[in-house]
Amino acid sequence: MNNFDKKIDNYLQNFEALASLSLRFILGIAFIFYGSRKFPLPPEGLVEYYDLHPILASTVALSELLSGIIIIIAAFIKNPLGNILTRLAGLNIVLLMSSILVVAHSDWFITTKLFSSVQIFLLVSGLFFFIKGNNK
């Protein structure tokens, strides 16, 4: 069994970067999608439904869009700047998703709704890139 495990590990090492890259692309595309749906600015839905100031609602939309773009582009920047951009985008995603869970979904805390929703996966994926950066 140990030998079989080593063979699988040796084979899959060739694809290790693909695991992080695929998670990064899905996360980035999701945030680009969610952010772009809030245009034109200010997003009237956020302003009216959550009673947000237009500047704050616009900041949310731009933060989502830019986080998605940056998390993808930073994968191809192979120097400390790429690592910093990845961590900043990850941190921004964590802050956005934490705020969204508190403001928009406060009834979800520690229920099946939370753990069966995309929001928790976006939050944890952002946390992954905040901690990991561009490091292997």
What do the PLM-derived regions correspond to, one by one?
Residues 1-37, 58-66, 70-136:
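Extended, low-polarity transmembrane helix blocks
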Residues 2-3, 40-54:
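Membrane-interface interhelical connector segments
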